[in-house]
């Protein structure tokens, strides 16, 4: 009986790290993707505001807020969602001449 109890204890101890790793993977998969627009020396602030309104449907106030964040902080998150949608958003921003990347949300 002592051997059975020892084996059960070892099995339980070995299962714990796998459960933690699996949980970490699930949490990483649950994090949405985001599109980040970066400051650049080319585009005018008015144009960036216009693009945010046109591509994402933001109000002038929200688009201006995001544009100022890009201008003052160097970047701003302009959209979030699935990886496919963020890839699409990045392509549209590139087509408009803006610098944009995508990443997992923090």
From Swiss-Prot:
Pfam family, any one: ClpS
InterPro entries: ClpS, ClpS_core, Ribosomal_bL12_C/ClpS-like
Highest taxon in the source lineage: Bacteria
GO terms of biological process kind: protein catabolic process; proteolysis
Subunit structure: Binds to the N-terminal domain of the chaperone ClpA.
Free-text function comment from the UniProt entry: Involved in the modulation of the specificity of the ClpAP-mediated ATP-dependent protein degradation.
Family: Belongs to the ClpS family.
HAMAP family named among the record's database cross-references: ClpS
Annotated protein name in UniProt: ATP-dependent Clp protease adapter protein ClpS
Annotated organism of origin: Nocardia farcinica (strain IFM 10152)
């Amino acid at each position: 009986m002592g051997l059975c109890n020892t084996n059960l204890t070892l099995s339980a101890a070995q299962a714990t790290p796998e459960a933690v790793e699996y949980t970490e993977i699930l949490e990483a998969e649950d994090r949405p993707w985001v599109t980040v627009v970066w400051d650049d020396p080319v585009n005018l602030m008015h144009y960036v505001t216009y693009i945010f309104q046109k591509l994402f449907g933001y109000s002038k106030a929200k688009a201006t807020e995001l544009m100022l964040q890009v201008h003052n902080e160097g970047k701003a998150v302009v959209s979030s969602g699935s990886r496919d949608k963020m890839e699409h958003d990045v392509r549209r921003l590139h087509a408009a001449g803006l610098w944009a990347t995508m990443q997992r949300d923090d």
